[in-house]
Amino acid sequence: MKILIVSGFLGAGKTTFIKELAKRTKKEIAIFENEYGTSGVDGDILKEATNVNIWELTEGCICCSVKGDFAASILTIANTVNPDYLVIEPTGVAMLSNLIANLSQIEYEHIRLMAPISIVDALSIERYKNEFPEIYKDQIEFADTLVFSKTENLANEEKDKLNLEVSEINPNCKIITDHYSTLPD
């Protein structure tokens, strides 16, 4: 089972990205949703749109407060559903570095962690930087690929500025500024 983390702040477009990903693949996918509240809104959206298995954890954050439950859930998914891919959508304020560390501690030969993706809302990036600077930096620094959402109406100069800004934090990441529905399979 390959594990893909799709991180990003609330409203950045994680669920839409995952829905598009699930629609395009022919592989079996399970999606692990981590949201706050009694029921996961994003999980309901994904259930409507796709025929994937959805696992939800709505109490606590998988990167810090419920690490043990999270690890147990990953092993349960691997041993019962055993999908080709497990896509993890953490809460918008999760520390990507902590989540990667937690997954790296799970010792199971049938699990492989893929390079993580962070979705960044191009229209809210300044707010993220000002209100959540540590999380903002972490989600960029530990992502292998950064996908900017909501760039449809941005000029190329604005996109270039965004690329430069995140490249200063993570010079090795792949940056995508086109809408992800236009990406090749």
Task: Give the ranges of each region predicted by the language model.
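Well-ordered beta-strand positions
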Residues: A115, D144-T145
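Residue-level signal for inorganic ion chemistry
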Residues: E35, E89, A143, S149, ...
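C-terminal accessory "lid"/substrate-recognition subdomains
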Residues: F142, L154-D185
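Charged helix-capping and loop-helix junction motifs
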Residues: E131-I135
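Short histidine/acidic/glycine/proline-rich micro-motifs that form metal-
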Residues: I125, E152-L154
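Nucleotide-state-sensitive switch-loop elements of NTP-binding domains
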Residues: K2-S7, A12-Y128
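A short, aliphatic-rich alpha-helical micro-motif
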Residues: T80, K137-I140
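A short alpha->loop->secondary-structure connector
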Residues: S104-I111, Y136-K137, N163-N170
